[in-house]
Amino acid sequence: MVQGTLYIVSAPSGAGKSSLIQALLKTQPLYDTQVSISHTTRAKRPGENHGEHYFFVSEKEFCQMIDDDAFLEHAKVFENYYGTSRLAIEQVLATGVDVFLDIDWQGAQQIRAKMPTARSIFILPPSKTELDRRLRGRGQDSEEVIAKRMEQAVAEMAHYAEYDYLIVNDDFNLALSDLKTIIRAERLRLGRQKQRHDALISKLLAD
């Protein structure tokens, strides 16, 4: 079985990261590509299902998983814990399915340290002006919040050079095409192709 690839995707808020990942998943069958499902201690919201949106666990269970080094990365956000299970990711990758993980640069650093075979993608907006427009377009934040988000975005973008691939999301369809191209290129790497076509290669090279 050909091993799947873990893709780490990071971007500042407003760059279109989540929209690109969701659009990608709609074009890929589940046996090819999936999105990572995190563990969390926060309460389940209406319409959310365990194992579909999150793995909902108690704080005691989560802390035990930390002690057992069960997470590729974890963080505490607004009094709730969130983490990416190493076992859950490895089980999916072992079936040959590629996994996408939407995470910030700090989480990406943790994951690369524990899983160096992961591929990382950073998504940039085409300009600060466009990023500001997108943040304002949500129509739900005050000027103070928008200014804070812009400040955080600049800090986040400063880490772009730590990633393997860089996509500028100016034209959404072009950015989506770039994302698909990265996946296609990774699947054509020698190691994966050799595994996939081992029988064919053996026959072609036989005397």
UniProtKB/Swiss-Prot annotation:
Subcellular location: Cytoplasm
Pfam families the UniProt entry points to: Guanylate_kin
Gene Ontology molecular functions: ATP binding; guanylate kinase activity
GO cellular component terms listed in the entry, alphabetical order: cytosol
Span of domain Guanylate kinase-like: 4-184
UniProt entry tagged with the keyword Hydrolase: no
EC numbers: 2.7.4.8
Keywords: ATP-binding, Cytoplasm, Kinase, Nucleotide-binding, Transferase
The keyword Acetylation belongs to this UniProt entry's keyword annotation: no
Chain residues that bind ATP: 11-18
Disulfide-bond pairs as recorded: none
Catalytic EC class: transferase
Reactions mediated catalytically: GMP + ATP = GDP + ADP
Protein purpose: Essential for recycling GMP and indirectly, cGMP.
Family: Belongs to the guanylate kinase family.
Name of the protein in its database record: Guanylate kinase
Organism: Yersinia pestis
Organismal lineage: Bacteria, Pseudomonadati, Pseudomonadota, Gammaproteobacteria, Enterobacterales
Gene: gmk
